[in-house]
Every structure is written in C-alpha cells, then in structure tokens.
C-alpha cells in the first residue's frame, strides 16, 4: 500500500486514482496524520502531495519529521519536493518565472524512477517557487526550461517538481508506477474483483443475520451498494425506492427492471401525490430542495417503521464514496460532521441504526467498475448524474404535473438523439431545463404563447469545473424540431453556452 500525505493540492486525489488504476492500493491522509496511525497502516511508501503554500512561509504545512524514521521510500511532488529540499537543508525561493501548464521535461541522469520513460516528454507544472540549491547527498535527475532541478533523488527519497498524476504529464503514470513497484516493492493486488470478494466476506461477517435498510435512488452509487449487499446477505436486505414523481421518463420502470434482472427484491413507494401537494405554490429553489428532503424522510421513515415492526433493522446502508471520506478530514482539520447522502441526512432519532458504507474506499469510477463486476449493466452504470431533488430543480418556478410531463418528454428526446448520434458518452452531463418563460410562436396559421425550454450539455471530469459542449448546429436543429413538434406546450428551444464558473451545471 502507498500512503499519500495531503498538503492541499487540487490534484491529490488524482495521485491515488492513477496508482489504483495500475492495480496498486493507495490511501490519502492529511499531512498532520500521526506517526502512530501511519505505522498502523504499514505503507510500503509515502507520497507527499503538492499544495498551495510556500515551504519558507511561517504557516507552511509540515508533516511530523519522524516520517523519515519509518525507513520507507518517499516521493515528494511539487510542494512535497520543495518540503524535502527545505527539510534537508537545500534552498527554495520564489521563482522569477513561474511555471503553470505544460513544460518539456528532459531526463539528465538515469534512475529507477525513470525506467522505461522517454528522455524528453511533456509534463504539467503548477508552481510559483523553485529549488535553486540541493541538500547534501541529493542528485538532479531531470530539468525543465525554468526548473534546473525538476527531479531529484537521494537513496530512497525522490522529488518531482511537476505533477505526474495529471493526465497532461505524458509519462506520469509510468513514473508513479515505477516508484510504487520498483522502488517500494508493491504488488498489483488492487482491483474490483478482489475488492468484491473481500467486501462480500466482510459484510457477511459484520451483518450476520441482521437486517439492513438501503434507500435506492436509481443512481449508480445506491444501486451498486444494494447489489453488493444482496450478494452478501440476500433477503436480509430491505431496498426501498421512493418514487417522488420527479424522475426522468420511464425511470421507475427502468430501476424496477434493473433490480429484477439482478434478482434483488425492491420495495417501491408511490409518493407522487404527497410530494406534488407539498410543492404546490413553491417556486424558490432552496425551499423546493428543503421540502423534497423533508418529505423524503417522512415517506422513508413510514416505510422503515413498517419493516422495523416485522423484524428489527440494525443497519442503514449509505453510498458514501472515498472523496466524501477525504473531504471529511481535510488539510484544514477534521470536520465535525461527515458529509451525508442527500437521501438519508436528518433521519429521526428512533432510527438508531449502525451505519454501513460498503463503497467508502472507492472513487466514483471504481464504483462503476465494481458495478460492472457485480453484473449491473454498462448502460445503467454510465448514465449521466441526476440531482437528488430530481426534475424539481430543472423546472424553474412552481412544479406541476403538466410541467413535469413536458420536461420529461423534451429531456427524453434530447437524450435519445445524443445516443443516436453517439454523443451521449462524449458529454459528461446533458439535460433539459423548463424555463418559467413563455414566448410568442407560430404553429401553422395560429399564434402560440408557450413555454421555452433550454438544452444543457457540458464536458467535465468531476463536475467541479465544466465547459459547455460544442454540439453541431445540425444536431441542435434536429433536437429543436423534434421537441417543438412532439412536445405539447413548447414552442421555443435554446442552448445554454455558459461554463462553470461562472454558472453552475444545474440551473437551480
């Protein structure tokens, strides 16, 4: 196992993801993690991440110096390398020419960490400081146009001024793999087949004959959690799907068919009437979210009570992923409250369940791979993200049954055309937004005054930032024609060309 000490870099999670993609199990902890906890994890190597600070600043992040007594290889990346240089007596200063973006790395000295790596390659830089003098015993391995010491080595200690974890670094994955396999002696034992076998055995032992309640939203995470649990405990899983009437077209039927194929019993609650009555007259987005969240809890509680009376439920399953775990203990210090799934946050006190989070070690892409391993269809696993409050936050203004129907039909056409054109898997997320704006139109010889709808499609890697998708005009024209001809009540279609920032992906 490789352990990454996080100094606050926006790229830290990528380090773990790249190594895991190579089959090497990797965890992330904050830079201030105690030596005792690090020793318990027994890592074969440490990686010190990048970070936004300068090592010579008074408030610079610095780990416990005893990490050097652990006798394991250490790799410092960007800030991590500068920390190593500073700690061992070298000199780091503010750079006259800062490096951001792509640069050419030139290897000047053979090293195990560069085995099989091209002499010259593109790497990704993101630093304002640079090393001008190495500590005693260190050797320069590579340089870039503005960094004379772009890679350094002293025995089992290595430093890289660039970011090998970023996809723009052409040989970055190979360099990280060399560190883990050739320097640290790790083995490629991490993969979803192994994880599934291990986790099913662990869940069987932990849960035994107890019952587990699992809220199923129809999304990837909750579906994979339910599938994994069912493999472990069979009918002791109580999977509950609440249909709040704000789902995509045919969503309920699709989820039911999926669970039938997986042979997992699913308790479906038709709560459309309850949700729509509570949303009547409400147009403020945050209030809509609040009402949906509270109503979900009411409906979920009622269903849970029903099952609780039949036989005590001991566990509540949640689709927490590894990024949620990392965020709960960030470099800014431990968080008091671990981020909860929107569907189960704020449950009443009588539901004194033990929490079970089978996916808490996994990134989103790994959860998808696990789902594939467990037999969940690829088509289902690769669906675009969908907000917890559903179509309520894609209908601007008050929600009504007729507006939901209108939006469902338009959205269905947009997604169907994206799939026909082989574009669905090329955009990160696509959907329609029903605007609370009417416009004048002409249908035949008649004047119309109907809804306008907005198409939204974005490209992103994680949703933190996004750019609008450049869809061909002919494609947009086809979608527009279909929507205005096939969906009653819509006479105008617009396309959103706002990126994030300044906009958000969803409108509400």
Swiss-Prot record:
**By its UniProt entry, which CDD domains does this protein fall under?**
GATase1_GMP_Synthase, GMP_synthase_C
Q: Which residues form the Glutamine amidotransferase type-1 domain?
A: 1-189
Q: What protein does this entry describe?
A: GMP synthase [glutamine-hydrolyzing]
A Pfam family assignment: GMP_synt_C
In the UniProt record, what gene is named as encoding this protein? Answer: guaA
- Per the Swiss-Prot or TrEMBL record, the active site comprises 78, 163, 165
Query: What reaction gets catalysed by this protein?
Result: XMP + L-glutamine + ATP + H2O = GMP + L-glutamate + AMP + diphosphate + 2 H(+)
Domain GMPS ATP-PPase residues, every copy: 190-383
Native source species? Helicobacter pylori (strain P12)
Question: What's the subunit arrangement here?
Answer: Homodimer.
């Amino acid at each position: 196992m490789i352990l990454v000490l996080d100094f606050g870099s926006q790229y830290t999670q990528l380090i773990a993801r790249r190594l895991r993609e190579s089959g090497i199990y990797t965890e992330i902890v904050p830079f201030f993690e105690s030596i005792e906890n690090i020793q318990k994890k027994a890592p074969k190597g440490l990686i010190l991440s990048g970070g936004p600070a300068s090592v010579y600043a008074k408030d610079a992040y610095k780990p416990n110096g005893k990490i050097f007594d652990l006798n394991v290889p250490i790799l410092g990346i960007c800030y991590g390398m500068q920390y190593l240089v500073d700690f061992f007596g070298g000199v780091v200063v503010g750079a006259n020419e800062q490096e951001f973006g792509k640069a050419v790395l030139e290897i000047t000295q053979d090293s195990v960490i560069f085995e099989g790596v091209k002499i010259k390659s593109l790497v990704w830089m993101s630093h304002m400081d640079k090393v001008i003098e190495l500590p005693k015993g260190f050797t320069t391995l590579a340089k870039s146009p503005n960094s004379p010491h772009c890679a350094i080595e002293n025995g089992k200690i290595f430093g890289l001024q660039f970011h090998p974890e970023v996809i723009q670094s052409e040989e970055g994955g190979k360099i990280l793999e060399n560190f883990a396999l050739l320097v640290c002696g790790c083995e490629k034992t991490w993969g979803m087949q192994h994880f599934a076998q291990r986790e099913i055995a662990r869940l069987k032992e932990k849960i035994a004959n107890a019952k587990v309640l699992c809220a199923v939203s129809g999304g990837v995470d909750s579906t994979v959690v339910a599938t994994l649990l069912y493999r472990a405990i069979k009918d002791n899983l109580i999977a509950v799907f609440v249909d709040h009437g704000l789902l995509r077209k045919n969503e309920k039927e699709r989820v039911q068919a999926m669970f039938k194929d997986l042979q997992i019993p699913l308790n479906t609650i038709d709560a459309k009437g309850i949700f729509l009555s509570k949303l009547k007259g409400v147009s403020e987005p945050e209030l809509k979210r609040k009402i949906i969240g509270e109503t979900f809890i009411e409906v979920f509680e009622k269903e849970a009570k029903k099952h609780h009376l039949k036989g005590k439920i001991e566990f509540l399953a949640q689709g927490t992923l590894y990024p949620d775990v990392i965020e709960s203990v960030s470099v800014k210090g431990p968080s008091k409250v671990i981020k909860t799934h929107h569907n189960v946050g704020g449950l009443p006190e009588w539901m004194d369940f033990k929490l079970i989070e089978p996916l808490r070690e996994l990134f989103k892409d790994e959860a998808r791979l696990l789902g594939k391993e467990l037999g969940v269809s690829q088509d289902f696993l690769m669906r675009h993200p969908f907000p917890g409050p559903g179509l309520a936050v894609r209908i601007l203004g008050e929600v009504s049954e007729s507006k939901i129907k209108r939006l469902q039909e338009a959205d269905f056409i947009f997604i169907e055309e994206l799939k026909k054109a082989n574009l669905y898997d090329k955009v990160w997320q696509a959907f329609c937004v029903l605007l609370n704006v009417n416009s004048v139109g002409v249908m035949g010889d008649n004047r119309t005054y109907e809804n306008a709808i907005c198409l939204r499609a974005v490209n992103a890697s994680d949703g933190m930032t996004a750019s609008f998708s450049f869809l061909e005009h002919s494609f947009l024209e086809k979608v527009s024609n279909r929507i205005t001809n096939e969906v009653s009540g819509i006479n105008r279609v617009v396309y959103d060309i706002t990126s994030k920032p300044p906009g958000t992906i969803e409108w509400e």
